Each structure stands twice: as structure tokens, then as C-alpha cells.
Regions:
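N-terminal glycine-rich dinucleotide-binding loop that anchors FAD/FMN and/or NAD(P) in oxidoreductases
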Residues: 43-76
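Glycine-rich FAD pyrophosphate-binding loop
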Residues: 8, 24-50
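Short beta-strand to alpha-helix junction loop
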Residues: 76-84, 104-123, 187-194, 217, ...
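Predominantly flavin-linked oxidoreductase catalytic cores and closely associated redox partners
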Residues: 115-116, 120-319
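A conserved FAD-binding loop/helix module that cradles the flavin
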Residues: 187-197, 202, 402-428
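Beta1/beta-strand and adjacent pyrophosphate-binding region of the FAD-binding site
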Residues: 2-15
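Residue-level recognition of phosphate/Mg2+-coordinating polar/acidic sites
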Residues: 40, 61-64, 81, 87-105, ...
């Protein structure tokens, strides 16, 4: 091993900063530099959780990691034995960021401001002597005979900064080449395959990157008139598959959002992509999978309120606007009496409450957390060190790997965990 180890961290996001900080603590004599292609670091951390930074989750409601990590759950289970959500919670509190856990088990800084996390990471890295270079975009990696890795950067002229201020409206770029003994790729998820070219050129297999965590566009105009309505909890599923999710559902001016939809989009990411985001979604508005219990509930309403109008009694306390919409969707008049429903009407009502179908016509955005599934195949990675099996001295952390999660702080937890593991081994 050389006396002075030069380490490059490519990507100034959550995984990159965590890897750099842990590497510097474990290998204090190493020269470590974070290279970020944009003019500011930790941009995604800044906007996650609506700017409050949902940095992890208590995992109290997760019985199987596959619930949280549709892809990569086996690796995360293995790595959590070394650095899990409790370690991350303690790490930030020990580094000066008090945290709070909400009722939904999401963890935020007490300040409710993502800059508390950003300042902690940037200041800790600087204090330890980690260098930070913005406006450096990696364009090529070459293996040298002395086992170093030669990195080629496209550098935007004008000094990069941490605040995000642009140095010029039309920056001029130059090419720079630097050799390093160790390199960690922490560039996050990429929506385009060509973004992985310098890694596939080295021989890495790339799982096709496609969107995950998105909302659904719904064709039904009358349904979209219910925008702003929240129903919680519900079950969502895709008929003909085992894909399902649960949680609150938000009706928007374009269709459906909320955890019940975002979770489903994550678990069904590849299926939805293969079907060009044109599918049917089933909504169980009453969050009850036992149809017999729903039937008992409806019969109870009829017995207790035979002369009442449908509109006046809301099963399962459904929101008024949604209930009126469902009545009309069934072809019933709101003034119809409960005693007039009959067996056929009751069966239709039960079906509507438990298996209400809508046509999905494309996906919307989830601006708080842009996530892709796909990336570097885990088959190419040493699962203990996260070093490449294809290219020695090259490591990976974060969403650049084929790991992704549902919303709720799980993606950032994967960044902390994989960054920590890389920081333990990159200087060995």
C-alpha cells in the first residue's frame, strides 16, 4: 500500500459524504476528495421530505425488509448487521443533530430543516480534512498498470461552491485527468443507460434504470374532481398480479398520489415499465380484505337505517365527496333508500368498496424524492466490502447500486449504510 493513499469519492450526495467521512476516520492519513458534477452538493438531501429531510425510519412497521426495499433487500439485511437505522440515528445525534421520530415512524431533524443534515455532513467532512470539488463530472475511468485508476473529468470553469450559485450562465469546460489509488462511485440513480457507460466499459453489468416512486395519472375526469381528498388507509393492487400496497391515498388533479400509490409504484416499477404505464389499479377504499366482514357492515347499515338515503350514511366513515362519487359510479341516485338496495345492489356496493378499478394512463412525478430502480448489478459487487469484482479498488455506495426503496426515509438509510461500509474498507 502506498504511504499516501489518494481516494476519490465520485458524487457529493448522502452516500458520498458518508463514505468520505467514515473513510477519513478509519484511514486518517489518506487524501480524500469528493467530486460533484453540479455546482452544489447534497441537492437531493435538501429537497427530500419536503425540505425537512426524512433521513431514516424506525422500521417499527417493517416486518420484512422486502416491504421497504423491493430491490436489494437481501444485501440490506446483511449490511444492517453492521450499520442500521439505530446506528444512523445515533450517528447524527452524536454529531450535533437532534432527531425526532414521527407517528408514521419517519425520522426528521428536530429543526424540521434539511440544512441541519447538510451542514452536519459538510462541516464534519471539512473538519476531518476531506476536500470538496464541485463542477467535476466524471467521464471516463481507466485502469493503470500500477493498479491506480485514472479518472477523466469534464470540469466547468468557475469555482464550484456549496451554495448552488452559478458562476456563469454559459460555463466553459475543460478536461482534467487525475489518478487515484481508490475510487468510490456514489453518483446516485440515473434515469438513462448512457450515464453508466464509463462503468459498463469496465465490464460491469447494468440493470436497466427505470423510474420508481411516482404517482399515477387517472383518466376518469369525475374522479379527479375529488382532488384534495385523502382516504386512509386503503389497499391498492394491480389485478392479475401479486403486487399490492397499503397506506393513505391522495386524490390529485392528475389522479392518485400518497403512500398507497408510491409504494405500489416502487414494488411494481418493472411491471409498470413493461406495460408502458397503462394498467388497471384496484382500490380497496375500506382497508378490509375480508369481503364477508364488509357484507356484514353493509347489512348492519341497512337494518339500522332502512329509510335513510344512501348519501346520508357513509360506510366506514368514507369522505363525503368520495362516497357521493362512488354512489353515482354505481349508477345509484343519492336519494335512494338503503332498504331499496337489494342483493344485487349490495353486491355491487361491496365490489365498489373493495375492488374499485381505475385506468392508469401514465405516471406523474414525485418531486420530493426522485428514485430509480436499476443500476450496478449486485452480482458484480463483493457484498462484504462493496468493492467491484470486475475492477479492483473501485467501490460503490448508494442508489448507483441496484438498490431502491419505498418512500419513508428508507432510500437515505441505504445511502448511510452503504456509505458506511465503503468507508470501512476503501483504505484497506
Amino acid at each position: 500500500m502506498p504511504q499516501s493513499l489518494h481516494i476519490a469519492i465520485i458524487g457529493g450526495g448522502a452516500a458520498g459524504f458518508f463514505a468520505a467521512i467514515e473513510a477519513k476516520r478509519n484511514f486518517p492519513h489518506a487524501d480524500i476528495t469528493i467530486f460533484e458534477k453540479n455546482s452544489k452538493v447534497l441537492a437531493k438531501v435538501e429537497i427530500t421530505g419536503g425540505g425537512r429531510c426524512n433521513l431514516t425510519n424506525s422500521f417499527e412497521e417493517i416486518s420484512d425488509l422486502k416491504q421497504a426495499y423491493p430491490r436489494g433487500h437481501k444485501l440490506m439485511k446483511r449490511l444492517f448487521k453492521r450499520f442500521d437505522y439505530q446506528h444512523a440515528f445515533d450517528w447524527f445525534e452524536e454529531n450535533g443533530v437532534p432527531l425526532v421520530t414521527q407517528e408514521d415512524q419517519c425520522v426528521f431533524p428536530q429543526s424540521q430543516d434539511s440544512h441541519s443534515i447538510i451542514d452536519c455532513l459538510v462541516n464534519t467532512a471539512k473538519r476531518l480534512g476531506v476536500k470538496i470539488q464541485c463542477n467535476h463530472q466524471l467521464t471516463a475511468i481507466t485502469e493503470l498498470e500500477d493498479e491506480r485508476l485514472l479518472l477523466e473529468f469534464k470540469v466547468s470553469k468557475g469555482k464550484g461552491n456549496l451554495s448552488g450559485a452559478s458562476s456563469a450562465s454559459h460555463p466553459v469546460s475543460e478536461i482534467k485527468q487525475i489518478a487515484f489509488h481508490r475510487v468510490a462511485i456514489t453518483t446516485g440513480g440515473h434515469p438513462k443507460m448512457e450515464s453508466f457507460k464509463h462503468l459498463s466499459d469496465l465490464g460491469h453489468a447494468i440493470e436497466l434504470p427505470i423510474p420508481s416512486l411516482f404517482t399515477f395519472n387517472i383518466a376518469d375526469k369525475a374522479f379527479k374532481n375529488l382532488m384534495g381528498t385523502v382516504v386512509e388507509p386503503v389497499y391498492t393492487s394491480i389485478p392479475g398480479t401479486k403486487l399490492k400496497a397499503e397506506g393513505p391515498l391522495l386524490i390529485t388533479h392528475w389522479g392518485m398520489s400518497g403512500p398507497a400509490v408510491l409504494k405500489l409504484s416502487s414494488h411494481a416499477a418493472r411491471y409498470l415499465h413493461e406495460n408502458n404505464y397503462q394498467i388497471k389499479i384496484s382500490v380497496n377504499w375500506v382497508h378490509e380484505s375480508n369481503r364477508s366482514l364488509v357484507e356484514e357492515n353493509i347489512q348492519g347499515i341497512i337494518i339500522a337505517n332502512p329509510q335513510k338515503q344512501l348519501a346520508s350514511i357513509r360506510p366506514y366513515n368514507l369522505p363525503s365527496r368520495l362516497w357521493l362519487f362512488l354512489i353515482q359510479k354505481m349508477g345509484c341516485a343519492p336519494e335512494k333508500k338503503w332498504s331499496e338496495m337489494g342483493k344485487k345492489g349490495c353486491n355491487l356496493l361491496i365490489e365498489t368498496l373493495t375492488n374499485d378499478l381505475y385506468q392508469v394512463n401514465g405516471k406523474g412525478a414525485f418531486k420530493e424524492e426522485f428514485v430509480t430502480c436499476g443500476g450496478i448489478s449486485l452480482n458484480n459487487i463483493d457484498l462484504h466490502t462493496l468493492e467491484s469484482k470486475v475492477c479492483p479498488h473501485l467501490f460503490f455506495a448508494g442508489e448507483v447500486l441496484d438498490i431502491d426503496a419505498i418512500t419513508g426515509g428508507f432510500n437515505l438509510q441505504a445511502a448511510w449504510t452503504t456509505g458506511y461500509v465503503v468507508g470501512q474498507h476503501i483504505g484497506e
